[in-house]
Amino acid sequence: MAKGKFERTKPHVNVGTIGHVDHGKTTLTAAITTVLTKKFGGEAKAYDQIDAAPEEKARGITINTAHVEYETANRHYAHVDCPGHADYVKNMITGAAQMDGAILVCSAADGPMPQTREHILLARQVGVPYIIVFLNKCDMVDDAELLELVEMEVRELLSKYDFPGDDTPIVKGSAKLALEGDTGELGEVAIMSLADALDTYIPTPERAVDGAFLMPVEDVFSISGRGTVVTGRVERGIVKVGEEIEIVGIKPTVKTTCTGVEMFRKLLDQGQAGDNVGILLRGTKREDVERGQVLAKPGSITPHTHFTAEVYVLSKDEGGRHTPFFNNYRPQFYFRTTDVTGSIELPKDKEMVMPGDNVSITVKLIAPIAMEEGLRFAIREGGRTVGAGVVAKIIE
């Protein structure tokens, strides 16, 4: 049976549930789809359908993730939920599921737990811009003062990791009651409040085409009589014929002019996000451009060698290393289209990193790469992936 045509009339936003094990992330996910389906149509998903998340591979890493979708009056949401803590770590670091905002689920009966903290830290490190809190299992807490205390703890924890704890929407409810069809304050009403918080607190994300032009260089050709053509897929923004662009990374940044855009052997007057194009550059020699650099709107992105990152190290079963690595480990860092060697500095309290761990590191590359916070990369040894990471903070 053919699926109904996907009507992309409402703006699209990506979200996901995060939080400690057994605090009710999957139950909440099921409750949201159930309650919103009644109101706005769509497809309700039962707990078991979400819990039996299929395996997927992102950059060679196995991750279990459930994807559901739902609609509110104003938006269409794609929502990810992971069964295990390790899946969250991998998901957030690889960016397999980019989140425009996260729903932090915290049990009112238990308060913040170790993974509550770890997921907030991860969200900060990988650049999840907004967090909304669902204080779950409120039906199990009779004491209003206790609820207030838990809410305060969660706000403090958010503030500690540079989220605006005092201004974060916190919805109190019970995912279980909502899922069972309870129409009270803690049931369906709470889910509708959460939907409203999603709609109002998380801004509509900028579309890729509205960003500053950026295209990773995949290949460079010299065409006699025309000049140098650089091919790749436009990651964001638009490039128009006649515009000035910069070549950034590996070598000192240089300015050039786009004198032509080709797609499928046809000449266009512009290339935009998602297009695989060839860009003709005026006065640029073939040897001035190489794979691993980017073409970008002047001043929009800068090259860097020194940064902190959050990384996940593949386990042996995932084809990763069989042994730990230590301070000053020197693998290759694969950014966009090329490998650059770099050295890793571990946190003071970490002597070594075991396969299957995630860790915050500081990296120094031997050549600069066009970089911004939130950029994903792979860690490789002789061409095989041994880790995945995301730039947390640029140092220089």
UniProtKB/Swiss-Prot annotation:
GO MF terms, alphabetically ordered: GTP binding; GTPase activity; guanosine tetraphosphate binding; translation elongation factor activity
Region (G2): 60-64
PROSITE patterns on file: G_TR_1, G_TR_2
Region (G1): 19-26
Region (G3): 81-84
Main subcellular location of this protein, as a coarse class: cytoplasm
Coiled coil: none
Region G5, annotated ranges: 174-176
Alphabetical UniProt keywords: Cytoplasm, Elongation factor, GTP-binding, Hydrolase, Magnesium, Metal-binding, Nucleotide-binding, Protein biosynthesis
Gene Ontology CC terms, in alphabetical order: cytosol
Subcellular localization: Cytoplasm
Recorded catalytic activity of this chain's protein: GTP + H2O = GDP + phosphate + H(+)
Similarity annotation: Belongs to the TRAFAC class translation factor GTPase superfamily. Classic translation factor GTPase family. EF-Tu/EF-1A subfamily.
Record NCBIfam families: EF-Tu, PRK00049.1, PRK12735.1, PRK12736.1, small_GTP
Subunit structure: Monomer.
Record's protein name: Elongation factor Tu
